[in-house]
Amino acid sequence: MVELEDLPNVGAKTAQKLRDAGFGDMMRLATATAKELSVKAEIGEGVAEKVIEAARRAEKIDFETAFDVMERRKDVGRITTGSKALDELIGGGIETQAITEVFGEFGSGKSQLSHELAVTVQLPEERGGLDAEAVFIDTENTFRPERIEQIANAFELDLEEVLNKIHIARAFNSSHQILMAEKVNELIQEGKNIRLVIVDSLTAHFRAEYVGREALATRQQKLNQHLHTLQNIANTYNAAVFVTNQVQARPDAFFGSPTKAIGGHVLGHAATYRIWLKKGLAGKRIARLVDSPHLPEGECVFKITTAGIVD
């Protein structure tokens, strides 16, 4: 295994700076930008470029064949949602190495699904989990351990063990939210088996802080930076990223849906899978897969019960 000190232009002092800044993992270093590395590790941008290039050579980041990509995708894991119908709709569960976005109106089930996944990721693979831990970045004070208890009991899991494997970060503004996502790397380097990062909600702070057209460009730039960090985590650690999103009214919509997801093209392009949640009759929820690289659009119905998400 190649260590940081083995790279050209990296002495003991620089290596320590890189580790302190969260770049102790070679793949994390190889996928960084020179500007990002320069700012966070407090090294010159020229040095940062050389270090990144050396890390890319060490990780053999280059062109690969489609067969290589197919072989690598065999490592992709999936986390059950608790609903067989919803799992089938999205190809077997929430996928690692990808960002999955769910959007919908208040009460459509976004936070409920977030709580469910924080538990099911801990299940063994034969039960639809990854035998791993979760990070829950809570931007709207929606996380409730009492809800985790109900779901854990339904799966007959030890409550204390389940709670200890969910790492909560209460984010109070967009800058704090971005910082907490960046600190996920530190948790993993400390030995935590993080395979799921939940952000509930992704856009709430950005929407509240950057108001009006004059702030739109700055908001989208910061949101793009945040999504880049999340995608890096997904790729580097074979983790799943699950984000919830709000919707807003479309007063000019004479046909189709009267609402649309917040985040614009930046989020639309960054999310690998996009799922629209809607309220149905008799307490049911409707999930519609609206975007996927390889799956067709489709719908399914599930329920939210005391035990969690069920068919």
UniProtKB/Swiss-Prot annotation:
Q: Which HAMAP family match?
A: RadA_arch (MF_00348)
What is the protein name stated in its UniProt record?
A: DNA repair and recombination protein RadA
| GO BP | DNA recombination; DNA repair
Top-level division of the source organism's lineage: Archaea
Identify the residues that bind ATP. Answer: 104-111
InterPro entries associated with the record: AAA+_ATPase, DNA_recomb/repair_Rad51_C, DNA_recomb/repair_RadA, DNA_recomb/repair_RecA-like, DNA_repair_Rad51/TF_NusA_a-hlx, Hlx-hairpin-Hlx_DNA-bd_motif, P-loop_NTPase, RecA_ATP-bd
Name the NCBIfam families on file: PRK04301.1, recomb_radA
Q: Family per UniProt? A: Belongs to the eukaryotic RecA-like protein family.
Q: Which SUPFAM superfamilies match?
A: P-loop containing nucleoside triphosphate hydrolases, Rad51 N-terminal domain-like
What this protein is reported to do is described as: Involved in DNA repair and in homologous recombination. Binds and assemble on single-stranded DNA to form a nucleoprotein filament. Hydrolyzes ATP in a ssDNA-dependent manner and promotes DNA strand exchange between homologous DNA molecules.
Write the record's keywords in alphabetical order, separated by commas.
ATP-binding, DNA damage, DNA recombination, DNA-binding, Nucleotide-binding
Recall the GO molecular function terms of this protein's record.
ATP binding; ATP hydrolysis activity; ATP-dependent DNA damage sensor activity; damaged DNA binding
* Organism (species): Methanothermobacter thermautotrophicus (strain ATCC 29096 / DSM 1053 / JCM 10044 / NBRC 100330 / Delta H)
